[in-house]
């Protein structure tokens, strides 16, 4: 039996249908809204100092640019790069795009997006001034002394919350592989399989990102490396977690652990001079070249170009050099 709706009921049904239509309409996703979701998802994993510093800076920049720069398209991403370079330094532009790329990758994992629009923009950012990073390297016996100091907690302060030995495996891994510290920090047990290490990510300044070449590489595991990896605890997914269980903060590690140890070894005469953690990479590359491994192979293993190896990493240690006689 048909019944005529009263005006009041008809009005209620109209209002209900309008409400449902609004509720079912998907919200417009752009970089700013995705960035907000990304921060919520990562808040417990990222240091409070990073959130207060870097995240606040990214907030300020993204709220400044026009809406058309924040849409997910190749043209909008390119426009964003142009607008950032107009107003900000190259270093700030790079930082914002690093976070944009990280948020975009998270969006892909959450099935909110299907591609990353920011990965290929970095080659268009002007190079900043050289960082003054030295390419000198440690000799084999110096690395052995450094590793021994980490393992024995020889120089640990009574005020130190965590022992130096926690980082022994991490330092030994860097010495045996020539990995960038940020690559080792990002390494998970799932990346190690069939006698090889898959290098596809790097963790730096609170961001999990691609390697600096934007390409993954396979690194073979020899007997030394196999022994090290098999001796590490597998209590979580990260191969080299911090004492608290998250990602290692490389800056804090360098200032609180690496620098005090190496400087004390320099003072005792067992290490020739202080060099940063990154120089373990230079040391490995130089050692491979001295062992007559060809440059192309060393470059592939290190995730570098052959001409970069020739230009920057073939370090001559003059203080220990013995000239051949003719």
Question: Whereabouts are the PLM-identified features?
Answer:
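Short, surface-exposed polybasic/aromatic micro-patch for ligand or macromolecular engagement
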Residues: 1-25, 212
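Basic/aromatic-enriched alpha-helical hairpins
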Residues: 15-88, 103-105, 263-264
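Catalytic-site neighborhood detector that most strongly recognizes the C-terminal catalytic loop/helix
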Residues: 44, 137, 203-205, 302-326
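Basic, Lys/Arg- and aromatic-enriched nucleic-acid-binding interface segment
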Residues: 94-96, 109, 113-115, 119-181, ...
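DNA major-groove recognition helix of helix-turn-helix
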Residues: 97, 188, 289, 302, ...
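Conserved tyrosine-mediated DNA breakage-rejoining catalytic core shared by Y-recombinases
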Residues: 123, 186-231
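Short, basic (Lys/Arg/His-rich) helix/loop patches that form interaction surfaces
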Residues: 150-164, 177, 219, 234-238, ...
């Amino acid at each position: 039996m048909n019944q005529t709706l009263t005006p009041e009921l008809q009005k209620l049904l109209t209002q209900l249908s309008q409400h449902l239509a609004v509720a079912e309409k998907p919200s417009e996703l752009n970089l700013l809204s995705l960035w907000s979701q990304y921060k919520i998802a990562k808040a417990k994993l990222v240091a409070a100092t990073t959130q207060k510093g870097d995240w606040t800076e990214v907030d300020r920049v993204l709220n400044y640019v026009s809406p058309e720069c924040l849409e997910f398209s190749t043209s909008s991403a390119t426009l964003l790069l142009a607008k950032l370079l107009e107003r900000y330094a190259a270093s700030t532009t790079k930082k914002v795009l690093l976070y944009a790329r990280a948020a975009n990758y998270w969006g892909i994992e959450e099935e909110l997006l299907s591609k990353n629009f920011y990965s290929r923009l970095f080659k268009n950012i002007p190079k900043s001034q050289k960082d003054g990073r030295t390419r000198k390297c440690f000799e084999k016996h110096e690395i052995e002394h450094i590793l021994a100091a980490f393992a024995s907690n020889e120089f640990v302060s009574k005020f130190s919350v965590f022992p130096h030995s926690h980082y022994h495996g991490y330092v030994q891994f860097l010495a045996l592989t020539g990995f960038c510290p940020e690559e080792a920090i990002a390494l998970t047990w799932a990346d190690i399989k069939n006698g090889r290490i898959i290098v596809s990510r790097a963790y730096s300044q609170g961001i999990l990102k691609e390697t600096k070449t934007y390409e993954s590489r396979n690194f073979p595991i020899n007997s030394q490396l196999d022994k090290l990896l098999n001796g590490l605890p597998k209590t979580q997914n990260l191969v080299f977690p911090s004492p608290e269980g998250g990602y290692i903060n490389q800056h804090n590690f360098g200032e609180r652990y690496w620098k005090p140890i190496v400087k004390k070894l320099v003072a005792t005469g067992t290490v020739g001079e202080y060099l940063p953690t990154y120089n373990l990479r230079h040391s490995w590359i130089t050692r491979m070249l001295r062992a007559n491994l060809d440059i192309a192979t060393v470059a592939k293993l290190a995730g570098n170009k052959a001409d970069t190896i020739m230009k920057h990493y073939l370090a001559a240690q003059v203080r220990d050099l013995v000239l051949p006689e003719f």
